[in-house]
Amino acid sequence: MKSVLMVAEKPSLAASLAGILSNGRCTAKRGTGNGCSTHEWTGNFRNEGSVHFRMTSVCGHVMSLDFNKKYNCWDKVDPIQLFGCATEKKETNPKQNMRKFLAHEARGCDYLVLWLDCDKEGENICFEVMDAVKHVINNVYSDQVTYRAHFSAITEKDIKKAMETLGHPNENEAKSVDARQELDLRIGCAFTRFQTKFFQDRYGDLDSSLISYGPCQTPTLGFCVKRHDDIQTFKPESFWHLQLLAGQPEVTLEWARGRVFKKDIAIMLLNRVKEHKKATVESVASKEAYKSKPQALNTVELMRICSSGLGIGPFQAMQIAERLYTQGYISYPRTETNQYPTNFDLPAVLHVLKPSADFGEEARSILGDIQTPRKGKDAGDHPPITPMKLGNRSDFDRDTWRVYEFICRHFMGTVSRDLKYRVTTAKLSVGMETFSCTASVLIDAGFTKVMTWSAFGKDEPQPPFVQGTQVAINDVRLIESQTGPPDYLTESELITLMEEHGIGTDASIPVHINNICQRNYVHIENGRKLMPTTLGIVLVHGYQKIDPELVLPTMRTEVERMLTLIAQGSANFQDVLRHAIKIFKLKFMYFVKNIDSMDALFEVSFSPLAESGKAHSRCGKCRRYMKYIQTKPARLHCSHCDETYALPIGNVKVYREFKCPLDDFDLLAFSTGVKGRSYPFCPYCYNHPPFSDMPHLGGCNTCTNANCPHSLNTLGISSCVECPTGVLVLDCTLAPTWKLGCNRCDVIINCFKGATKITVEEAKCQECGAQQVNVVYKSDKSKFKDGSEEKSGCIFCSADFSHLVEKHRAVASRPVRSGGGFRGGKAGRGGGGMGGAAFGSGGAVTAGGGPNAGGGVRGSRVAKDKMGQLASYFV
């Protein structure tokens, strides 16, 4: 029997598809730690008859584009190189081992059916999956082996129809995504690296860890700053208008001239009107008016209404919509189309909604009088967003229900009658001047019966006038007003501008808006208004000063046009890339050359590093206090040496009076809280690792200096069981609260609370190979069961320690000390030790005192070149 591998985009989607295609008769098995289950059943496939189906999934993109490793060091690579350096595809989440998982599931399979989302990103993921299984499934790029399912909703009808009408992956659309990824990577990283380093080395209160540039993100910010500039430069202007009060009951009438901007003319016209005691009713006319029902719902309109009507930002709104889609409640939520297909079964959707306790009555009413929906735009991608399955209020959290209810009510509104009302207008003349009043009365609520937020409002009283009669003028007034500035852009208005200018896609628009918020370029105020920060304003003004095209939407619009040509097969992938990269490289060179123009704006708005922060710890070079700058990104700055040192994100304080034995910098203690990660570190070593095997931005728990009582060599206990290269290191920074922390991942083991001293000994556990420890308590506070003050043993195996250690992640510890150097290899339980580190002899840290190194030292390491770097200064 032949086998068919089928791959969906998300685990939940795979489960739904498998249930539908197998008619509920599939069996499931868990994946290998990546959250992706596999569902299996037997059924018929095309002309093959009975086959074995295997349905699994990925978790979004399998691969992501990045630069080669040597280009990822900001300090060593000139950003201009990023426009031409080599790139490579890397696994998006290496911990998931998705390529290995897919290859494993593809073993023995003869066909591949791809159920990825039906958009350009989905096409791109199709080819990532094909690449992962190409060595397992023969001839996987053949149309006779690999098939593509096209669907817009997770319903039995749609899914089974997609299975009967399988197509093939679209390579052109996949390439257009590759081109966009590469352009965004090269352009964004080059500008971001340069301006981040340039400005963070100069100013201390930028309050942003990354000063990013993005071909879509920056024009998006530009719209917000332009509106801010319009508000700031707005000059109010006075104007006047006449207001007439006439009749009984009294009615306020509006002046036909509207506004007059010259006061003397307004006074002259006022005096003319005052010459008359009565007004003549020239006409009283009534007519029916209509308010059109909405068009079918597309992504942009969904985001707009969620922001303006529900107070839910576009990023969160799309997360909710995608969750509703994967659960089968709505159709595919990313679509530009707002017109139903001619064969769309409108009554079927209403039948789905009939049983609802919240809007079932409206659905039943509309079923008896379905109206033809309005015409819209058919973008050729997916049908509009419609409800596919009935959900109840109790099925969702509050925001999810509100989005789902809106989608349901909007659909019902699109097949309802237009709102109809009657407008009565009365026109009166006073000399040469004309005044009028209007009143509206509802005739048919139409679609607003179900879309209650668009309700008509109260009926207005009809004008009490009869044509041809005269009415007494009760009063006439000259009203002075001033023009007002525009308001800040709302998210809804920004989405409209982005759509009009082709900035982003229906899928990426919410991401770009979210990015400018996270980068601290704008703040969201009441009413979902976007107010630019000082940093956002200065950035945009700086781009405008150097090269306005960097912030105008025209550049991105042109890039999107070229990407569309690739997707349509009308343009060559490499030609488009070369052309776009060449243009932006020239712009980058010009930007770097003229950066002083932008710096002049920053100088006015932000404080120099030397004037920022507060005295914190001593520099190892000049022994003066460095300034601690807490605004993002946190860093230390030595104004005497004019050097800046990056810090980890969290709480940083001076670690008692300890100093680094290599460079004499004060040691610091990093912590994210008692239950979080913590470790000591030297600010110089953290930024300039002294050993080749110490990672950049690593703490003392990654340093292999055998002469340091705080290093990995001294305080390492065992290899981490959760990650392949990590070591569990004793953390003494919060003593007498002690814990082991992995120096590579987030594994934490709390132990020996209240102990006064813990020493990592030379001896190893005979059972698991971990280093033994010596634990000391005060006599009146001992937590050993026999009341002893001091005991030695293995943290993980000793019965005396079992009640004092949280063993939830340390059951299968592996040894780390051996006679060899730092190799990073693996060994099984009790298998002779893992070359995690060549540990020196036991070091100890007491809760109240300094470090005590006991015994001799093995495996001493020589610093790579740090002492050479500092030699001239110390001499």
From Swiss-Prot:
One Gene Ontology CC term in the entry: DNA topoisomerase III-beta-TDRD3 complex
Active site: 332 (o-(5'-phospho-dna)-tyrosine intermediate)
Reactions accelerated catalytically: ATP-independent breakage of single-stranded DNA, followed by passage and rejoining
Ranges where the Topo IA-type catalytic domain occurs: 170-589
UniProt KW keywords: DNA-binding, Isomerase, Topoisomerase
GO molecular function: DNA binding; DNA topoisomerase type I (single strand cut, ATP-independent) activity; RNA topoisomerase activity
PROSITE patterns in alphabetical order: TOPO_IA_1, TOPO_IA_2, TOPRIM
EC number: 5.6.2.1
Domain Toprim: 3-153
Enzyme type, top EC level: isomerase
Any single Pfam family the record assigns to this protein: Zn_ribbon_TOP3B
Keyword Isomerase: yes
GO biological process: DNA recombination; DNA repair; DNA topological change; positive regulation of translation; siRNA-mediated heterochromatin formation
Span list, region Disordered: 371-391
Function: Releases the supercoiling and torsional tension of DNA introduced during the DNA replication and transcription by transiently cleaving and rejoining one strand of the DNA duplex. Introduces a single-strand break via transesterification at a target site in duplex DNA. The scissile phosphodiester is attacked by the catalytic tyrosine of the enzyme, resulting in the formation of a DNA-(5'-phosphotyrosyl)-enzyme intermediate and the expulsion of a 3'-OH DNA strand. The free DNA strand than undergoes passage around the unbroken strand thus removing DNA supercoils.
Stated family: Belongs to the type IA topoisomerase family.
PANTHER family: DNA TOPOISOMERASE 3-BETA-1, PROKARYOTIC DNA TOPOISOMERASE
Protein name (database record): DNA topoisomerase 3-beta
Organism (species): Drosophila melanogaster
Organism phylogeny: Eukaryota, Metazoa, Ecdysozoa, Arthropoda, Hexapoda
